[in-house]
Amino acid sequence: MKVIFAGTPDFAAAALKAVAAAGFEIPLVLTQPDRPKGRGMQLTAPPVKQAALELGLRVAQPEKLRNNAEALQMLKEVEADVMVVAAYGLILPQEVLDTPKHGCLNIHASLLPRWRGAAPIQRAIEAGDAETGVCIMQMDIGLDTGDVVSEHRYAIQPTDTANEVHDALMEIGAAAVVADLQQLQSKGRLNAVKQPEEGVTYAQKLSKEEARIDWSESAAVIERKIRAFNPVPAAWVEYQGKPMKIRRAEVVAQQGAAGEVLSCSADGLVVACGENALKITELQPAGGRRMNIAAFAAGRHIEAGTKL
């Protein structure tokens, strides 16, 4: 069975490797163009391209697929049975969706129809969801509205960051899409069910500004945001005129004026919130490395009563 693969980041690279390891023929891999990255802004290949080249696969990097006759012709010439799409980042027009014999399967990191859109992992943590998961979806022209082929649940742990949930769902998604491809190969079809009309939510793209901590919110809400926005865009506060990223924190039952430092020690930097307080245990000063609060407090002293 011939499988086109389309994806860009690590989440997708894991799936590509799994599909290849399962023995499926992959005549073409689509990924986004190389982009400048890092402090030196060096042109860097996306993880999917790196994985594809290691596997000896053909790679194409079109800037767009919509109104791109050359890319469409390339897809048609492959005569693929199915396309697997994972965090590709480009819109697939209807003519692309229709090109493979069995259409396009998408690996989506939520329990659809909850958290359709760009940032499902982060929004699930931010909202305090007890669980999330992966859906393998038969793609249609809508935004994550296609029929669901399979659903795989994951319990969000109380200390899980977006990075940790990402890594867990990355492995779940890779195994899930291989299982569904094997079913398609053996039976010649997939049993997909329509998404419920109720329970639809949208996972809007993250912004740096929304990651700025508002101390008037409850400590529980802020703590979830810290985990949801870790590693990027990273929850932050202004400290000495510069942004300081907050990496880990926990809720404590203390009270004070919102944004007021209640104590600073090797155990934690405690800041009052709209309800309860937050004990910060790991942070990252502007231009510096991540550090635990003991290392931070050793070189700085923040007086109780200071406003953040």
Curated annotation (Swiss-Prot):
This enzyme's EC code(s): 2.1.2.9
One Pfam family of this chain: Formyl_trans_N
Keywords: Protein biosynthesis, Transferase
Entry annotated with the keyword Protein biosynthesis: yes
GO cellular component, one term: cytosol
Positions that bind (6S)-5,6,7,8-tetrahydrofolate: 110-113
Entry-linked CDD domains: FMT_core_Met-tRNA-FMT_N, Met_tRNA_FMT_C
Catalytic activity: L-methionyl-tRNA(fMet) + (6R)-10-formyltetrahydrofolate = N-formyl-L-methionyl-tRNA(fMet) + (6S)-5,6,7,8-tetrahydrofolate + H(+)
Domain of life: Bacteria
Gene3D superfamilies: 3.40.50.12230
GO molecular function: methionyl-tRNA formyltransferase activity
NCBIfam families: fmt
Role according to the record: Attaches a formyl group to the free amino group of methionyl-tRNA(fMet). The formyl group appears to play a dual role in the initiator identity of N-formylmethionyl-tRNA by promoting its recognition by IF2 and preventing the misappropriation of this tRNA by the elongation apparatus.
Similarity section: Belongs to the Fmt family.
Protein name (record): Methionyl-tRNA formyltransferase
